[in-house]
A protein has these predicted regions:
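Hydrophobic single-pass membrane-targeting/anchoring helices
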Residues: 1-41
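Solvent-exposed, non-transmembrane segments of extracytoplasmic/periplasmic domains
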Residues: 39-198
Length: 198
């Protein structure tokens, strides 16, 4: 219940703040899943074939499409939890890591939205910001938010990545317990690199 609960807490804090685009945890939104994919190769979309048609977009190995307008390769054996059509979470079999991805319509300045959410996250137990900074993701402006918090006596580490593309906002997030950090970061990196906007 720790991972799912951690996600719920984050969702409440972010919702109260107008939350970062697609984030639901007291610092992010958790989701169960582990990646075993290879880095995605960004594509500008399907290439034209015969006049008026296009070739379907190719996905990274192991990636599957989600209703939110994206595809990603999630770990085998992780529990899938669909929050909404545009938000999906995966939880590792041991419950020590969650992955989440979501999409929504872009609303204003991404960094300002996340700063507001971060201010509200101070309500969480033992919340400690590590960083909240602008970045890029595949050439798009992005925001990275990293922090720690405690839920039901269990420490958690969160890494959230948000970016806007073509009028939509996307998030690729993870929450994990510190004792699985090495594997959790490897899994998150693989899942993040497989993320493809459709």
């Amino acid at each position: 219940m720790g991972v799912v609960t951690a996600g719920a807490v984050v969702a409440i804090v972010l919702a109260a703040a107008g939350g970062p685009p697609d984030d639901n945890r007291a610092g992010g939104s958790p989701s169960p899943s582990s990646a075993r994919s290879q880095p995605a190769t960004p594509s500008d979309g399907p290439s034209p074939t015969v006049e008026g048609t296009s070739r379907p977009q190719s996905l990274p190995p192991g990636a599957h499409r989600e209703a939110g307008g994206f595809a990603w390769a999630t770990p085998t054996g992780w529990r899938r939890d669909i929050k909404t059509g545009a938000e999906v979470h995966y939880t590792s079999p041991d419950g020590k890591q969650e992955l989440a991805a979501k999409s929504s319509l872009a609303r204003g300045d991404l960094m300002e939205t996340w700063r507001t959410s971060e201010q509200n996250a101070h309500q969480g137990k033992d919340y400690r910001k590590i960083r909240l900074e602008e970045s890029t993701f595949r050439g798009n402006p992005a925001v990275v938010w990293e922090y720690t918090f405690t839920l039901e006596g269990v420490p958690w580490h969160a890494r959230l990545l948000g970016f806007n593309e073509n009028g939509k906002s996307y998030q690729i997030n993870t929450w994990y317990q510190p004792d699985v950090e090495t594997q959790a970061l490897k899994t998150y990196g693989e899942v993040r690199d497989s993320f493809t906007v459709l």
